[in-house]
Regions:
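Active-site region of the double-stranded beta-helix
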Residues: 1-21, 34-184, 192-240
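Long, charge-rich, low-complexity alpha-helical segments
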Residues: 10, 17, 25, 332-388
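Proline-centered helix-kink/hinge sites
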Residues: 27, 189-190
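Active-site proximal loops enriched in glycine and acidic residues that flank catalytic Cys/His/Asp
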Residues: 190, 207-209, 356, 381
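C-terminal amphipathic alpha-helical segment
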Residues: 222-301
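Acidic, low-complexity/disordered tracts enriched in E/D and polar residues
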Residues: 267-346, 369, 380-388
């Protein structure tokens, strides 16, 4: 994405200007970020998704000061009447299930893919919402249908109400209020308190971002490192502890200092190689969510497959890269030269033309076929200068 091109999506700011002035710093209200905005998925189809085990959904109802929360899958018939006020359905990761929603999410790739998470859709009847709260991540709130009133404010106190199934602030003090119409969008940095209430029936699209926590990320990397070390067991990299200078024990149960040092050195050695850690990070960042399943080609497609062909990534595929590796759906592959350039292009643009794909080496072509058999990409009739 061109970082210095002004975007209507960002109120005429360039991506570079937005990131410098607003990202993780201050809110931005954008009127008509998407002119003529209409829902990309109809209400009936959206509400049907609450019954799917492949979709993360929540049903929230407010009755006065009382809140109830049900997590999906739930029966569509159990939802209140559309004329009943004060209820909301939240559908997470709709971009994984709908091409149009997935295409909309791609407009926010001025933020690195490693940080872009998903698009959640909130459907609400009159008065519906989830109460005043704050998120630990950046969020764009795009109004797709109807109106929603937003109250926002910086919080000094983040105490939550007790006995409530939602994380609702105990003492919310709004500083500003906006009513968003279809096409309007509000950006909020992490920790900025907000309370959205439906004005009549409405749909709001929330574009959210990943915020790795240091402890959680370290835990995942160390788990991967443990598997890496297990694979090295018994090889030349697996040094055996030796203590020819060990004296006779005076304190029988005392741990020898030399053994403590050996353990410390073993861990330090494992953490010392940045390539291993970078590889594990890429695998972690591209790991599909537990609910994600791919659709491998059927037998007829397998028989008809011909390479080279146009390549279009499946909307559920996560693909990143660094200087030496390509990461796809939790797996890592070394790539160099022309292969690296073409696979990086695939990660950036989500497609390759047949002519471009023909430039891959035989080894890379075999890898592409294996990915296709997993359902990670689909053959496509792409012309040389773009997509048909």
């Amino acid at each position: 994405m061109q970082k210095n091109t002004p975007l209507i999506l960002l109120a005429g700011l360039t991506p570079a200007q937005f990131m410098k002035r607003h990202w993780q710093k201050k809110p931005l209200l954008i009127r008509q970020a998407i002119p003529g905005m209409k829902p990309l998925i109809d209400r009936s189809t959206l509400l049907d998704m609450v019954e799917s085990e492949e979709v993360e959904s929540r049903h929230i109802v407010r009755k006065g000061e009382k809140w109830t929360l049900k997590k999906g899958p739930i029966s569509r018939k159990s939802l209140p009447s559309l004329k009943t006020p004060d209820w909301t359905v939240l559908i997470q990761g709709v971009d994984l299930h709908n091409d149009a929603v997935h295409a909309l999410l791609q407009q926010f790739r001025f933020v690195p893919d490693a940080r872009l998470d998903d698009l959640m859709i909130s459907y609400a009847t009159e008065g519906g919402g989830v109460g005043p709260h704050f998120d630990s991540y950046d969020v764009f709130l795009l109004q797709a249908h109807g109106q929603r009133k937003w109250r926002i404010g910086r919080q000094k106190k983040f105490e939550l109400q007790e006995g409530v199934p939602l994380k609702i602030l105990k003492a919310f003090k709004p500083e500003a209020e906006f009513v968003l119409n279809p096409g309007d969008m509000l950006y909020l940095p992490p920790g900025y308190a907000h309370d959205g209430t439906a004005v009549g029936e409405c749909m709001t699209y929330s574009i959210g971002f990943k915020v790795p926590r240091s402890a959680e990320l370290a835990s995942e990397l160390l788990m991967g490192l443990s598997e890496e070390m297990t694979e090295n067991a018994g090889t030349s990299l697996d040094v055996i502890y030796q203590d020819p200078s060990q004296t006779a024990a005076i304190k029988d149960a005392g741990i020898p200092a030399a053994l403590q040092k050996f353990a410390s050195q073993a861990v330090a050695k494992a953490l010392k190689d940045p390539q291993i850690l970078n590889c594990l990070l890429g695998e972690t960042l591209t790991e599909p969510k537990p609910s994600v399943w791919f659709d491998p080609p059927d037998q007829d497609d397998l028989s008809a497959f011909a390479w080279p062909c146009g390549v279009r990534l499946d909307r559920r595929t996560k693909m990143l890269f660094d200087a030496k590796h390509i990461f796809v759906n939790g797996e890592s592959f070394r790539a160099a030269g022309r292969d690296a350039k073409l696979l990086q292009k695939l990660a950036n643009e989500k497609y390759l033309t047949a002519k471009e794909a023909s430039g891959l080496s035989e080894a890379a072509a075999q890898l592409m076929k294996a990915w296709w058999e997993e359902g990670w990409w689909h053959p496509s009739d792409l012309i040389e200068n773009g997509m048909t």
